């Protein structure tokens, strides 16, 4: 990566691709997102040439090929580094029995969270295609995590595997979770009076209940305050039902990628 040049960061998740172009000092020049499939293209035409691109990809080889083609079309021969989890990096220690098996998005998110909230014990909840929880001690030790079906996947699964329940997508479910429904669910107990609202509210509360349970359990086990950090595509819906304090951060993975890139550049003396 060229010294002093901006860096292109790419977070390829299961539902969409997020990207950001950042200065060497960390300030953001531009950012955007696109869905999977060829109909959407990133708005890179007006951007300066980066020194390199850094990719976290959990969406598979076809998405990796698409990203490589997009980069080659805009910036031929641009260096591309695809990250993977490791045992230790940027002040975070990975306690997975096989560290490389941890998803690169979760790894970058842990690094981003550790830097964003220094000296704090964290529970990181990410509401994407899957809902993931990560327990991160203040010293940077990632002790482990949980993976559950995401909010949208949970609703779709019920619709596809039952005879009479509707299949709700995120847009339809959001329309059912209006302000009064969310307020009632937060006050609790909440019981809906039609099937679509029963499904959307039930899946929302299932997500919130998992997070609240683990946040309380973690504080009981560690006997210290734990900050709950939330993010992801369904964060608005799930966070609206949470009854515990939480902090939203929408760019943990990209922030972690920036730190990984900066650390690698420092190692190389770039």
Curated annotation (Swiss-Prot):
CDD domains per UniProt: ASKHA_NBD_PanK-III
Pathway: Cofactor biosynthesis; coenzyme A biosynthesis; CoA from (R)-pantothenate: step 1/5
Protein name per Swiss-Prot or TrEMBL: Type III pantothenate kinase
Necessary cofactors: NH4(+); K(+)
Chief localisation class: cytoplasm
MF-aspect GO terms: ATP binding; pantothenate kinase activity
Subcellular location as annotated: Cytoplasm
Biological function: Catalyzes the phosphorylation of pantothenate (Pan), the first step in CoA biosynthesis.
Domain of life (superkingdom): Bacteria
Gene (name only): coaX
SUPFAM superfamilies: Actin-like ATPase domain
Residues binding substrate, per UniProt: 96, 103-106, 195
GO biological process: coenzyme A biosynthetic process
